[in-house]
Amino acid sequence: MLLAPQGRSFSKKRMGLNRWKRFTRKPSPKPTFGPDSVEHWIKRVEKASEFAVSNAFFTRNSDLPRSPWGQITDLKTSEQIEDHDEIYAEAQELVNDWLDTKLKQELASEEEGDAKNTVSSVTIMPEANGHLKYDKFDDLCGYLEEEEESTTVQKFIDHLLHKNVVDSAMMEDLGRKENQDKKQQKDPRLTMEMRHKQVKENRLRREKELEYQRIEKTLKKSAFLEAQCLVQEEKKRKALEAKKEEEEIQREMVKLRREIIERRRTVKAAWKIEKKRQEENSQNSSEKVMFQSTHILPDEEKMVKERKRKLKEVLIQTFKENQQCQKRYFAAWHKLILDHRIKLGKAGTLSDWKIQLKVLRAWRDYTRFQKLERETQALENDLREENRKQQLATEYNRKQVLRHCFTEWQHWHGAELLKRELALTKEETRKKMDALLQAASLGKLSANGLSGISLPEEATAMVGPPVKNGQETAVPPLWEKPPLGSSGCMLSPPLGRTTTGNLQGSLQNVSLSAPGNKQHKTLGAEPSQQPGSNETLRTTSQKAEPLCLGHFHNRHVFQQQLIEKQKKKLQEQQKTILELKKNLQLAEAQWAAEHALAVTEAQSHLLSKPREEEPRTCQMLVNSPVASPGTEGRSDSRNSLSGLRRKPKQLMTPHPILKAMEERAIQRAECRRILAEKKKKQEEEKLAQLKAQEEERQKREAEEKEAQLERKREEKRLKKMKELEKQKRIKRNQQLEAIAKEHYERVLLRKKGLEPWKRLRMQSKQNIQVAEEHYSLFLQRKYMLTWFQRSQESLARKMAQADQFYSQILLKRVIQSWLQYVIDLQEEVRKFCVHFLQKKIFRAWFNMVREVKIDSQGKHEIAAEHSDRRILWITLRTWKKFVKFMKEERVKEERRQQLRRKVVEILPDFQVPGRYHELYQQSDTWSLSKTSLVNE
């Protein structure tokens, strides 16, 4: 509400502030200043102060030209500079304070005035920059006086123009308000110019913003592209570095392999050379001995024998030492082979155990998955059954409601028929009585005496019996049972007979698929169990229907909750199935990775062994399958019996995985040590290799041939290994298939043999139980039939009494409900009237508040205008006083100068130098001007 006037006032104010620009445009290239701008007022005050100072202090000095203060003053000392800065700061503070107060007062006003102020502002604003034409202070003062006179004249004219000459009553009579409104309308050209200007500014601003956004987008895009290029370059660089590193690693591996092969070759060659040398030495020594023995003298035979004996002893000793050394080496080699065999056996048993464990887990997951699928299928079937039952229940409820409505309609129809019959009988009796009275009045009664006597008797007979017959004959057709084959639904008992027993019986029998005569009998028999209860007699159709609906609603809610629970269970089972599938996939992938790792380790181990051990390792690998089937058979037998029995000794032994991990750690440490030794040897052998390069060139051809042979042997060995592995896999698969077959046979025996037999036994028991129940029900029905007939007769008698009582209660309740309805209508009318009155009052109050706000805004605008005029008047008055004060000061200064001249002429020359004298004069004048300004 209050935002619109403020917006209008702000727009008016902006228009009023910018209206002077149209009138102050001059063809001169000089810049124009607004009267409200701070720079304009600062410059104005600076010029005025400069003129005042120049006129006050430099009248004597004819040598200096009259120019502005900034060009005249030659500040030579720091004291002068400080004084000048202080004076300038004080003057600027005064101007800033005055401008702040003016701006605050202008901003506080909400609107700038109507058309009254527009004329004055238009006349005053064009002359705002008139002071810039004057360079002398006297001319400026004259201009200000003329401006003040023109403002006073304009004020007086405005006052005369806006003075109310005629009373408000006469103005209303003459219709002058419309003319005033027309006069107060503003010039539309100003608003159009302002709007055009605003549109141009907005367009320029929008174009700048769009340009800025476009530049930002281009910069962002370029930065993003640069970053993307840098990232791609970084990725390429990293990929190249990784590729180079891999290539270097491959080269190093090739170098290491070549060095190992060359070292083996050199060792073998050295062994061969040593053997040849030993054989040659032994042959030479034997030849020498045989040659010398022929030339030995008999005296020297003893010496020769001793030498031979000593030589034999030495040979025996060397042979023993060699044999011991060989035995020691062979024992170490045998121990290493045995350890290797033990490790291989452990690894094989561990891998077999892992495979069997994985198979068992996979089988367990598969069985669990099958079980979950069966459970989900059963749950889905249950849900379908529940849905079917729910549909049946809703259909049965709908039929019950229709039956109930039909019985109500039958009641109403019977009552209407009774009323019509009663009305007809009354009309007939009335006509007969009229005829009898007419005959009596005409005197025909004596002639027709017998007929006249008989007429009243017949009338009385006709009045009484029709009512009774109407009650007796019209009511029974409503309670007659409809034929079973005529309609699909049975008519429920009437409205008066609906009891809690009936409702309970109907709700209990909802699940039965074919409601026939049995249901009719139970529905009729259950009310007879409570013949003396008054509560069952008072239950009406209005109570019975909500009960039935309430039971059905609760049941429906329960079924919905059960369905939601089953859906949640289904979702959980599906999640578990997915998790089991993922576990199976992970287990298969892990098994494949472990198998590949074992194969690569075996290959690397075989490649690292020396050539001397190749035939022995081949024999071991050939013999290992012979031992492995036994171990595999034992492990399979153990795993097959592990599901039934567990030996206690197995629990005491440590886990094979831990042993394998410890052995692998030891192997890794040994490999590291061997690699460190190899590196040292490589560094030592590099020097030797440089010397032996020439010899190696000649031997390369032979070595290449040997390498080819070795490759062929290795390929054959690998083929044998692969064949052995295939045989092992085939055996394992056969064993696993046998275990799976046994398990399948067991499951078939359990599922197809025992469980169907159990189900057959249970079905037979259930059939016997159902037959016994059926027989008991048949006996009950047979012997209770007579009792049921008698109870039905008593029930019919009681139901007639209940119907009569029910009709009385129904009349009372109808009257009470009608009275309550009338009271509620009156209350609603009263509330509506109160609401309408409140709305009307609040609307009137709202209009009054709005008018008061508009009046207050107008008064506030008038007050703001008055304050602006008063401030302007005060400023002009101060300027006028300031001019007078400056003139008086000039006169006083001239007198002082005259007195000083006279004193100087009389007295000797004791005066201070010129610049100190000037500073003294400046300080005096500025102190006087400051005190005058503060006082004013």
UniProtKB/Swiss-Prot annotation:
Residues 189-270, 364-440, 554-592, 662-739 form a coiled coil. Residues 495-541, 607-656, 691-714 are annotated as: Disordered. Signal peptide: none annotated. Keywords: Coiled coil. InterPro entries: CACF_protein (IPR052270). Residues 497-516, 527-541 have a biased composition (Polar residues). Disulfide bonds: none annotated. The keyword Iron does not apply. This is Coiled-coil domain-containing protein 191. It comes from Homo sapiens (Human). The gene is CCDC191.
